[in-house]
Amino acid sequence: MSKKPVLGIMAAGMGSRYGGLKQIDPVDPYGNMIIDFSIYDAKQAGFEKVIFIIKKAIDEAFREGIGKRIEKYMDVEYVYQELDVLPKGYEVPEGRVKPWGTGHAILCAAEAIDGAPFAVINSDDYYGRTAFEEIYRQLTTEQDGATYQYAMVAYDLYKTLTDNGHVAVSYTHLTL
């Protein structure tokens, strides 16, 4: 493996349901944000570079609230998830203002990823250190004869639900 794994953090969400930039709101009495715990765990697992995938509109608030602190511990790069960054032949539908999602975030970050093995997380979800250790191990382990390598850290659905309100979750069905 010639390049070290990088961590992409999707933080372009506008917080429309939440009512603000959830990415930069503290979650404990010490002012830590969920993203702080993720970056700490990722660093402990071996990641040395983080790519923040953000909207240009939140750049200043994000750099002030998160980036400047993280730059002391990790290599940091910022990329913008802008709606008009699309493959040839596609265009933004009239009235669309929200970011497209994970695949689009990765497309916007492709140049910064630069062929390195990578993992992508949401800025406002907590994953735990084990998730970062497992994905880092996967990204740094050569797979004999594999043209492409894919991995996903998944959780039992019942462990992702809460009694404290609505949670949007995805469901993955693995077919071998």
What residue ranges belong to the model's regions?
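Conserved small/polar residues in nucleotide/adenosyl-binding loops
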Residues: 172-176
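Conserved beta-loop-beta/alpha segment of the NTase-like Rossmann-fold superfamily
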Residues: 82-169
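N-terminal glycine-rich phosphate-binding loop and ensuing alpha1 helix
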Residues: 2-67, 71-76, 81
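Conserved hydrophobic/aromatic positions in well-ordered beta-strands
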Residues: 25, 170-171
